[in-house]
């Protein structure tokens, strides 16, 4: 069985257009080790989410606002159309999306020792009104019951913290850190055209992140996924060929390629650029 799966992004979005508007607003492209999905709008969330993994954002169409709690203060982080952003682990965040927008989100599966938190605050403060810790397996199935519990709680009715605010001790604290600014994808490529001719260029990676996001230019690359999945995201005006286990796959621009764990392949970028993403735990 091949370790390569390729999906043409524009056609996939067109085929699933009905899922990018309320009440669904999102559609999962891949859902194994890497959770790769696109999100539409409008969707104005009231809750903040906390997790132990990192999240990669890219706004394909329109802008979004990622509400975050940065060093104890709530603020709006705007991710504009065409921008990328890597959210560090353990940072409280609340995505706010608008009509006629669509964005890519990539996150990893959780280890069985990792917990997520859904948290509601008192007004615009950073005071916790209601929170629940849980093990996330499916965001579509796991979050709605917790949100329903909040809207049926005394804390929601009174707007004040109470006996039901906390159900357990927090497994970990939110991270106290300065957040980076989003990166304009096309500007980054343009600024590194000369450098990428000599080999892959890091966009995100160590020591700041466990996730590795790399820019690849024209050329041949021996790639290995290792113990996790590897994404190859072909950019506009790009043509590439992937060879794996005796199979050859010719792929055009704006294709998302997933390489399964423990798989080796040869990527030949004939023209244009590719971005690779790996998210180890």
Swiss-Prot record:
InterPro entries: 3hydroanth_dOase (IPR010329), 3hydroanth_dOase_met (IPR016700), RmlC-like_jellyroll (IPR014710), RmlC_Cupin_sf (IPR011051). Residues 1-162 are annotated as: Domain A (catalytic). O2 binds at residue 45. It comes from the Eukaryota. One of its GO terms (biological process) is L-tryptophan catabolic process. Residues 163-179 are annotated as: Linker. It is found in: Cytoplasm. GO terms for molecular function: 3-hydroxyanthranilate 3,4-dioxygenase activity; ferrous iron binding. Its EC number is 1.13.11.6. Gene3D superfamilies: Jelly Rolls (2.60.120.10). The keyword Cytoplasm applies. Its main location: cytoplasm. Residues 180-281 are annotated as: Domain B. Its cofactor is Fe(2+). SUPFAM superfamilies: RmlC-like cupins. Keywords: Cytoplasm, Dioxygenase, Iron, Metal-binding, Oxidoreductase, Pyridine nucleotide biosynthesis. It catalyses: 3-hydroxyanthranilate + O2 = (2Z,4Z)-2-amino-3-carboxymuconate 6-semialdehyde. The keyword Nucleotidyltransferase does not apply. Belongs to the 3-HAO family. This is 3-hydroxyanthranilate 3,4-dioxygenase.
């Amino acid at each position: 069985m091949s370790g390569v799966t390729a999906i043409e992004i524009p056609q996939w979005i067109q085929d699933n257009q009905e899922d990018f508007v309320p009440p669904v607003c999102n559609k999962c492209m891949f859902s194994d080790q890497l959770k790769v999905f696109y999100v539409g709008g409008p969707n104005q969330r009231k809750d903040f989410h906390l997790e132990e993994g990192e999240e990669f954002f890219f706004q394909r169409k329109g802008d979004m606002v990622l509400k975050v709690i940065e060093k104890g203060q709530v603020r709006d982080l705007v991710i504009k159309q065409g921008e990328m952003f890597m959210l560090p682990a353990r940072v409280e965040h609340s995505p706010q999306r608008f009509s006629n927008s669509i964005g890519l989100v990539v996150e990893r599966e959780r280890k069985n020792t990792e917990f997520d938190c859904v948290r509601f605050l008192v007004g615009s403060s950073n005071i916790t009104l209601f929170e629940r810790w849980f093990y996330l397996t499916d965001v579509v199935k796991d979050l709605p019951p917790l949100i329903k519990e909040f809207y049926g709680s005394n804390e929601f009715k009174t707007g004040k913290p109470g006996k039901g605010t906390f159900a357990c001790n927090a497994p970990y604290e939110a991270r106290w850190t300065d957040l980076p600014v989003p990166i304009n994808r096309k500007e980054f490529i343009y600024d590194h055209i000369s450098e990428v001719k000599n080999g892959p260029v890091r966009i995100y990676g160590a020591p700041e992140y466990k996730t590795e996001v790399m820019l690849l230019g024209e050329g041949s690359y021996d790639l290995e996924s290792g113990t996790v999945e590897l994404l190859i995201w072909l950019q506009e005006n790009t043509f590439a060929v992937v060879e794996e286990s005796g199979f050859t796959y010719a792929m055009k621009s704006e294709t998302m390629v997933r390489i399964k764990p423990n798989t080796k392949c040869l990527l030949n970028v004939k023209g244009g650029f590719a971005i690779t993403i790996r998210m180890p735990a």
